[in-house]
Amino acid sequence: QQCQVRIDSEDPYKKDGEIQVKGINVMIGYYKNEEATKAVFTEDGWMRTGDLGILDRQGNIYIHGRSKNMILGPSGQNIYPEEIEDKINSMPGVVESIVVDRDHKLVALIFPENPGDNNVVAMMEAHRVALNKQLPQYSQIASVEVVPQEFEKTPKKSIKRFLYS
């Protein structure tokens, strides 16, 4: 076998867990960094990817987010901001968004197509109301903030979330 995958979950078919991999194609560790290597590998040699997901019966993996991005809801629910962001980003007039936890409330930061438009705040608020009708109570957006410029990104074009928390 070239690569093995497992989900670290009590029920990987129904409950999200961390996706872990093992095989000849997986790195053996970080160069001259034993501490980082120990942190990323389990005791039995599986590499923690940091991705969270589930399996289906055919062996397909469904990624729901990153463990470091997960937000713990008010009653201990796992909230995956990427899933909410995908919905926001598909709405008219939205270029990109991130969902953050501020004082135990979910806030959507949205960069719109036309940040200078006088109606943009009202439009994004209407999007929030519509979106919340599709979401469980614990993952509903409490407020929206329109940001005037694109989010700062990594070289791989991922939003630098830590700048906006």
What is each stretch, according to the model?
Residues 104, 129-165:
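Conserved C-terminal "lid"/linker of ANL adenylate-forming enzymes
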Residues 23, 28-29, 52-137:
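AMP-binding/adenylate-forming catalytic core of the ANL superfamily
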Residues 15, 56, 62, 79, ...:
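Generic structural signal for well-ordered beta-strand positions
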Residues 1-61, 67-70, 85:
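Conserved AMP-binding/adenylate-forming
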